[in-house]
Swiss-Prot record:
This is General transcription factor II-I. The modification N6-acetyllysine is found at residues 130, 334, 431, 696. Residues 671-692 have a biased composition (Polar residues). There is a cross-link at residues 35, 86, 92, 94, 130, 140, 185, 219, 221, 306, 324, 334, 361, 416, 431, 437, 469, 475, 507, 542, 641, 645, 651, 661, 696, 797, 808, 842, 845, 860, 872, 972 (Glycyl lysine isopeptide (Lys-Gly) (interchain with G-Cter in SUMO2)).
């Protein structure tokens, strides 16, 4: 706390010491409050006048600011003297009306002067490139008038401190303040550069102060009054600053002691007659410069070395004065190291608090988008005021420090734990809010297109061409020394525009004129073209890749089989029934897999994941809580060992009742000739052997009859399930046939809840085996919502009255034909009235839209991989390998999926924005290479490729039939229904 002893104020000898003690005590309390505010990064400055004492209290920056504003202190003391004198005068004598009017004028002049002074400070800050108020150095400007020019003042009025203007001038300045501006021409010169010896002497007499020391005497000139015995002499005022508070900097950050004392100079010493600084250095008088300057020097004033550094040579030749000026450059490395360390600390803090909230012991990942989407059910308490909860990478250094200071108070509040089970796909732009997100998507799409056009143009210029050419981004990443780009903004690497966000895209466009492509080895680009357009020339690489991935898959398969056998207590390896594990994750699962790798068949994995599994094979462990689920999938010899060792009842697995507990995969085992339940019961041992057929290694012969019987049975089961749920929604006990056309035409009034993720509501005849099995596993959650029962009943009556006699039979589901759904549509199309014809036209329109979208995607994908013709899109491969293929230009709210997953409205929007859609192959994946090779081998069989592209709308079966017609020798993999 700084205390100023001054004789300017009238002293009363009768004043009791108690009153002085009370004031001192209260100022100490105010000082403590300032320290607490400083810990929260708030800045305070306070000047108190009590009789003969002046107190300066506040935070470090607040005191520094007040100490630099000597005129402010002088005005405040002068104001207090005048106010006390006015109060005494008013108390002793009654003022006349004229005196009152004069008092009002004085107050008005004082107010106008303060307003003009604030506006001058604003204009000076604006001239320095700041949007905040910066104190005007009046003495320097008057001493060195050519350094800063002031425009817009009235003719004949020179620039000076507002206290020297009269009332008319003040009013004119405020009325025409829009025309007033400050122009900084050069930095201020040293006092000895001027000829005025008087000024030099005055400046020399004014001592330089250390931040923690005492200020020199302040000359305060007071106005004389009738009753005050104060003369016109200058009263000496001594200002004492309080010492630095070491506790304020008790929070130590790693790497905070390795810095210079530049910040100290920026905060305290700048205003102390430092006339040698550059113009940018003047901005350090503004408290907001703390954001930039503080990030450069990282230690508190009390812990900084006291050595001064000579500044770099300024634009104007000046003699160096190492004791007075501290000019330095921004140290990016130091700032980057500090902010990276702080963000890491905050990230670890958030993860630790989040783990405590969900009671998790291991490492956790915070779903930040979920917290932003469900602010009422998921939020964080205890964050400093004004700081929202976001990723630490979005905070700057001040906020990161405040968060760490408040780490004990931070707490994650999770009201609905079920929200944490949501997948990341739920948070994408599937259902964006209208307005902001659509505007953002349109903006980023436009910017990416502009940057892509810019890159193509610059790339063509580097090749000596005037026409834009597509940029081979992969080659630039592969050969950074021979192919690179100059002129990009700082810290922005050269990549495909689809990698950039809006800020980087805007920066690239701003510097578009200076961007230059450097191509030292043009033959690399020629080689790239041949690689893309003629993949057959690179067959040795593909063969090496095929050999490598085949070997790794076989190795992982052997590891899984061995670990599975160990879990069952067997010594010999046993084939793992992967679908059974997928269907029963509660009783059958695998522990110890590398992070981020789910348990699936090795044929799903690429080389990186296979290698990670092999490296961590020692940690892998199979957990089989219910062996009876897998017994039926083991060879007879192995099954008997399991029966004697693992199970309590030996005969249980061989009974027909136990087989009913096995998931619906058992349908695959039943041959198409098993028409009666008795036959299936008798052939139970045969089924046990045959049940291993779907899980044999790839390359075995695919049984179309078994697949056909299974998918037919599953479709019938799902249709019966839908009919039962529809009847329940109407409050009926019997099943009601679902009018699918009504659900498609009025999705707001008729819809279905509880379907598995990614499975739309459609006719069961359009689904493949995976979706049918998902629906049956999720049947308990499925619920039909019918908001208009009267419309529903009318549609049912019209449908039943117009159709031929019911076709319901009590025969076994396995007797149904294979393509019954399609045949039914054809029959109904001939026999039903006009209303149903309209419904069927919608179904036909949806089919046509799917074909058009599929053709569009195939054409764009073919362009992306360098083909001159459409290529079938591997939707499943793109989905399970995120980041390999990026699809830009999709409409807002529509994510990239197979056309069979898309709604009609989404497909129409995709076709409307067809010209903006673009596939970008970031890195190849196994399916992409195999697909290219497959297309090359079948170039002469154009119709076959076209058929497969058209058939993708109905999902798997059609594709599998086409592949099957080529002979079983070409089938190297399991049937992949959704590829």
């Amino acid at each position: 706390m700084a205390q100023v002893a001054m004789s300017a104020l009238p002293a009363e000898d009768e004043e009791s010491s108690e009153s002085r003690m009370v004031v001192t005590f209260l100022m100490s309390a105010l000082e403590s409050m300032c320290k607490e505010l400083a810990k929260s990064k708030a800045e305070v400055a306070c000047i108190a006048v009590y009789e003969t004492d002046v107190f300066v209290v506040g935070t470090e920056r607040g005191r520094a600011f007040v100490n630099t504003r000597k005129d402010f202190q002088k005005d405040f003391v002068k104001y207090c003297v005048e106010e006390e004198e006015k109060a005494a005068e008013m108390h002793k004598m009654k003022c006349t009306t004229q005196a009152n009017r004069m008092s009002v004028d004085a107050v008005e002049i004082e107010t106008l002067r303060k307003t003009v002074e604030d506006y001058f400070c604003f204009c000076y800050g604006k001239a320095l490139g700041k949007s905040t108020v910066v104190p005007v150095p009046y003495e320097k400007m008057l001493r060195d008038q050519s350094a800063v020019a002031v425009q817009g003042l009235p003719e004949g009025v020179a620039f000076k401190h507002p206290e020297h203007y009269d009332l008319a001038t003040l009013k004119w300045i405020l009325e025409n303040k829009a025309g007033i501006s400050f122009i900084i021409k050069r930095p201020f010169l040293e006092p000895k550069k001027h000829l005025g010896g008087r000024v030099m002497a005055a400046d020399a007499d004014r001592p330089m102060l250390s931040p923690g020391g005492s200020c020199g005497p302040i000359k305060v000139k007071t106005e004389p009054t009738e009753d005050s015995g104060i003369s016109l002499e200058m009263a000496a005022v001594t200002v004492k600053e309080e010492s630095e508070d070491p506790d304020y900097y008790q929070y130590n950050i790693q790497g905070s002691h390795h810095s210079s004392e530049g910040n100290e100079g920026a905060e305290v010493e700048v205003p102390a007659e430092d006339s040698t600084q550059h113009v940018p250095s003047e901005t350090s008088e503004d408290p907001e410069v703390e954001v930039t300057i503080e990030d450069d020097d990282y230690s508190p004033p009390t812990k900084r070395p006291k050595s001064s550094e000579p500044p770099p040579p300024p634009p104007v030749p000046e003699p160096t004065n190492a004791g007075k000026r501290k000019v330095r450059e921004f140290n990016f490395e130091k700032w980057n190291a500090r902010i990276t360390d702080l963000r890491k600390q905050v990230e670890e803090l958030f993860e630790r608090k989040y783990a405590q909230a969900i009671k998790a012991k291991g490492p956790v990942t915070i779903p930040y988008p979920l917290f932003q989407s469900h602010v009422e059910d998921l939020y964080v308490e205890g964050l400093p005021e004004g700081i929202p909860f976001r990723r630490p990478s979005t905070y700057g250094i001040p906020r990161l420090e405040r968060i760490l200071l408040a780490k004990e108070r931070i707490r994650f509040v999770i009201k609905k734990h079920e929200l944490l089970n949501s997948t990341r796909e739920d948070l994408q732009l599937d259902k964006p809010a209208s307005g902001v997100k659509e505007e953002w998507y349109a903006r980023i799409t436009k910017l990416r297109k502009m940057v892509d056009q810019l890159f193509c143009k610059k790339f063509a210029e580097a090749l000596g061409s005037t026409e834009a050419k597509a940029v081979p981004y992969q080659k630039f990443e592969a050969y950074p020394n021979d192919l690179y780009v100059e002129g990009l903004p700082e810290n922005i690497p050269f990549r495909s525009p689809s990698w950039y966000g809006i800020p980087r895209l805007e920066k690239i466009i701003q510097v578009g004129n200076r961007i230059k492509f450097v191509i030292k080895r043009p033959e690399l680009l020629t080689h790239s073209t041949t690689e893309v357009t003629q993949p057959r020339t690179n067959t040795p690489v593909k063969e090496d890749w095929n050999v490598r991935i085949t070997k790794l898959r076989k190795q992982v398969e052997e590891i899984f089989n061995l670990k599975f056998a160990q879990a069952l207590g067997l010594t010999e390896a046993v084939k793992v029934p992967y679908p059974v594990f997928e269907s029963n994750p509660e009783f059958l699962y695998v522990e110890g897999l590398p992070e981020g790798i789910p348990f699936r068949s090795p044929t799903w994995f690429g080389i990186p994941r296979l290698e990670r599994i092999v490296r961590g094979s020692n940690k892998i462990k199979f957990v089989v809580k219910k062996p009876e689920l897998v017994v039926s999938y083991l060879p007879p010899g192995m099954a008997s060992k399991i029966n004697t060792k693992a199970l309590q009842s030996p005969k249980r697995p061989r009974s027909p009742g136990s087989n009913s507990k096995v998931p619906e995969i058992e349908v695959t085992v039943e041959g198409p000739n098993n028409n009666s339940p008795q036959t299936s019961t008798v052939r139970t041992p045969t089924q046990t052997n045959g049940s291993n057929v779907p899980f044999k290694p790839r390359g075995r012969e695919f049984s179309f009859e078994a697949w056909n019987a299974k998918i037919t049975d599953l479709k019938q089961k799902v249709e019966n399930l839908f009919n039962e749920k529809c009847g329940e929604a109407l409050g009926l006990k019997q099943a009601v046939k679902v009018p699918f056309a009504l659900f498609e035409s009025f999705p707001e009034d008729f819809y279905v809840e509880g379907l598995p993720e990614g499975v739309p509501f459609r006719r069961p005849s359009t689904f493949g085996i995976p979706r049918l099995e998902k629906i049956l596993r999720n049947k308990a959650k499925i619920k039909f919502i019918i908001k208009k029962p009267e419309m529903f009943e009318t549609a049912i009556k019209e449908s039943t009255s117009s159709k031929s006699p019911p076709r319901k039979t009590n025969s076994s589901p396995s007797v149904n034909t294979t393509a019954s759904g399609v045949e039914d549509l054809n029959i109904i199309q001939v026999t039903i009235p006009d209303d149903d014809n309209e419904r069927l036209s919608k179904v036909e329109k949806a089919r046509q839209l799917r074909e058009q979208v599929n053709d569009l995607f195939s054409r764009k994908f073919g362009e992306a991989i360098g083909m001159g013709f459409p290529v079938k899109v591997p939707y499943r491969k793109i989905t399970i390998n995120p980041g390999c293929v990026v699809v830009d230009g999709m409409p807002p709210g529509v994510s990239f999926k197979a056309p069979s997953y898309l709604e009609i409205s989404s497909m129409r929007r995709i076709l409307d924005s067809a010209e903006f859609i673009k596939f970008t192959v970031i890195r190849p994946f196994p399916g992409l290479v195999i697909n290219n090779q497959l297309v090359d081998q079948n170039e002469s069989e154009g119709p076959v490729i076209q058929e497969s592209a058209e058939a993708s709308q109905l999902e798997v079966p059609a594709t599998e039939e086409i592949k099957e017609t080529d002979g079983s020798s070409q089938i190297k993999q399991e049937p992949d229904p959704t590829w």
